[in-house]
Swiss-Prot record:
Name of the molecule in the record: Glucanase inhibitor protein 2
GO BP, one annotated term: proteolysis
Glycosylated residues, chain numbering: 89, 104, 109
Domain Peptidase S1, chain residue ranges per copy: 29-257
Domain of life from the UniProt record: Eukaryota
Source lineage: Eukaryota, Sar, Stramenopiles, Oomycota, Peronosporales
Gene behind the chain: GIP2
Compartment(s): Secreted
One Pfam family from the record: Trypsin
CDD domains, per database record: Tryp_SPc
GO terms for cellular component: extracellular region
InterPro entries: Peptidase_S1 (IPR050430), Peptidase_S1_PA (IPR009003), Peptidase_S1_PA_chymotrypsin (IPR043504), Peptidase_S1A (IPR001314), Trypsin_dom (IPR001254)
Length: 289
């Protein structure tokens, strides 16, 4: 039997639950720990206003570009990004930069399988923070079983949780696509990580970075994935599916090198005026049973 996750309905239900959450019981990214202020400053919070709540994540990949997933442009208008900030909202640290254009990957979901789930945000002015390194095109930065780190301001309990006030990170092992395809229907532009009980990306971590740490500090980190979709949060044997960043390089590199906005799939918001809290999933995913 196949179980399909219907994303739009789920995200709206979770948004409603979030509004009623007890603010005294706020949780953090599932099974993770606080990332010290001033570290991983390429990890970006996407916001509707400069000081408002972060509703999605992303990664600074050039001084004027943030890479995220299409869910983060669909359910809210990404008017601002917070770069170098430790907190889920406010303006007391980092910088808040205006987004002047959002564009989806030109081949996003062309076959209906959710492939190339990427969105690129162009900033009004350059960030003062250093971008994260992009992976090698030959995919040699990803090896099954290696450790990676996911980051964001999302929940640690599911389905009842609320955003973290401080950025969190959690260490996760990468799966081979062959193994992950025994759990989910995925495509070559995906990479899976996690699947250990109690440790995962979760609601409101959507679009956030999955990185490979090479041991020489943040300047040596490599962006290998972006939080996309999954089945629940932190369930044993159920990893999160990430957008595989190496698959986007042919599209991304010409844009960030020429500093031009390339014609792309139009971005349309599903919710006008106010945003909900996106569920982790970026595309309907099918679970194999």
């Amino acid at each position: 039997m196949k179980v399909t996750a219907t994303i739009a309905a789920a995200s709206m239900a979770i948004a409603a639950a979030s509004a009623d959450a007890d603010t005294t019981s706020r949780q953090l990214i599932l099974g993770g720990s606080i990332i010290p202020s001033g570290q991983k400053t390429y990890s970006v919070g996407i916001r509707s206003t400069a000081g408002g709540d972060t509703y999605c994540g992303g990664a600074l990949i050039s001084p004027t570009h943030v890479l995220t997933t299409t869910m983060c442009t669909k359910h809210a208008k990404p008017d601002f990004v917070a770069v170098g900030t430790h907190y889920v909202n406010g303006t007391k640290d980092g910088e808040q930069l205006k987004v002047i254009q959002a564009q989806n990957h030109t081949d996003f979901n062309k076959t209906g399988n959710g492939e190339y789930d990427f969105a690129l945000l162009t900033l009004e002015k350059p960030s003062k923070f250093a971008p994260v390194k992009l992976p090698k095109a030959d995919d040699s930065d990803i090896k099954p079983g290696m450790w990676s780190k996911a980051m964001g301001w999302g929940w640690t309990s599911f389905p009842n949780g609320s955003p973290s006030n401080e950025m969190q990170g959690v260490n996760l092992q990468v799966w081979s696509n062959e193994d992950c395809s025994q759990v989910y229907v995925i495509n070559p532009t995906n990479v899976c990580a996690g699947g250990v009980a109690g440790k995962d990306a979760c609601v409101a971590d959507t679009g956030g970075p999955l990185i490979k740490e090479n041991g020489a500090g943040d300047k040596d980190d490599v962006l290998i994935g972006l939080v996309n979709w999954g089945y629940g949060c932190g369930d044993e044997g159920a990893p999160t599916v990430y957008s595989r960043v190496s698959s986007a390089l042919k599209w991304v590199n010409p844009i960030i090198k020429t500093k031009q906005v390339k014609t792309a799939v139009p971005v349309q918001q599903a919710i006008s005026g106010k945003h909900g809290v996106p569920i982790k999933q970026g595309m309907p995913g099918t679970v194999r049973n």
